[in-house]
Swiss-Prot record:
GO terms for molecular function: GTP binding; GTPase activity; protein kinase binding. GTP binds at residues 15-22, 62-66, 120-123. The gene is RAC4. The keyword Cytoplasm applies. May be palmitoylated. SUPFAM superfamilies: P-loop containing nucleoside triphosphate hydrolases. One of its GO terms (cellular component) is cytoplasmic vesicle. This is Rac-like GTP-binding protein 4.
Length: 215
């Protein structure tokens, strides 16, 4: 029990400003939905969580999506085990920025770290009054979310609503599972990297060449 509880998982949420990252974190950790928008006021959270019989110490990091934080935000990426990359189902711009901004940023600062793609504000996509008030709005469909997941290589795609708490727990359960039980392809990539490093090292020793790096 002690050994499993000592497993620490750092989960970092990223995505455009105002897509609901902070609300999702507050909802998950306190079962409350903040009615007012307050940009990124979530304190880092850490607690023991049990998923599929495994106890882990889950650490949650919130980040600001605004451009003013572009230099500071990557500091939170160091040591991340998994990213929750969020966009709003009622914001086409935030959906498009997953490919334009967030994937390049994560690949640059944290290559190889698994991503859970999340579509937030599910309740608004199905809210007729909200859609009538925003006649030019074209919500993101589930199929489009799945297509984006394939494009960026995310481990899974989940749609959630912090207001109704629908699938909020599922988001972070998925983030934990991808770390403690990596997908087969991810494990295979790690094994291949290890084999390539060993092969390169052995060849270097055999030929008595000076090694300056591992590939």
């Amino acid at each position: 029990m002690a050994s499993s509880a000592s497993r620490f998982i750092k989960c970092v949420t990223v995505g455009d400003g105002a897509v609901g990252k902070t609300c999702m974190l507050i909802c998950y950790t306190s079962n409350k939905f903040p009615t007012d928008y307050v940009p990124t006021v979530f304190d880092n959270f850490s607690a023991n969580v049990v998923v599929d019989g495994t106890t882990v110490n889950l650490g949650l990091w919130d980040t600001a999506g605004q451009e003013d934080y572009n230099r500071l935000r990557p500091l939170s990426y160091r040591g991340a085990d998994v990213f929750v990359l969020a966009f709003s189902l009622v914001s086409r711009a935030s959906y498009e920025n997953v490919m334009k901004k967030w994937l390049p940023e994560l690949q640059h600062y944290a290559p190889g770290v698994p991503i859970v793609l999340v579509g937030t504000k599910l309740d608004l996509r199905e809210d007729k009054h909200y859609l009538l008030d925003h006649p030019s709005l074209v919500p993101v469909t589930t199929a489009q979310g799945e297509e984006l997941r394939k494009h960026i290589g995310a481990t899974c795609y989940i749609e959630c609503s912090s207001k109704t708490q629908q699938n909020v727990k599922a988001v972070f359960d998925a983030a934990i599972k991808v770390v403690i039980k990596p997908p087969t392809k991810q494990r295979d990539r790690k094994k291949k990297k290890t084999r390539r490093g060993c092969s390169f090292f052995c060849k270097g020793v055999m030929s008595r060449r000076r090694l300056v790096c591992f590939k």
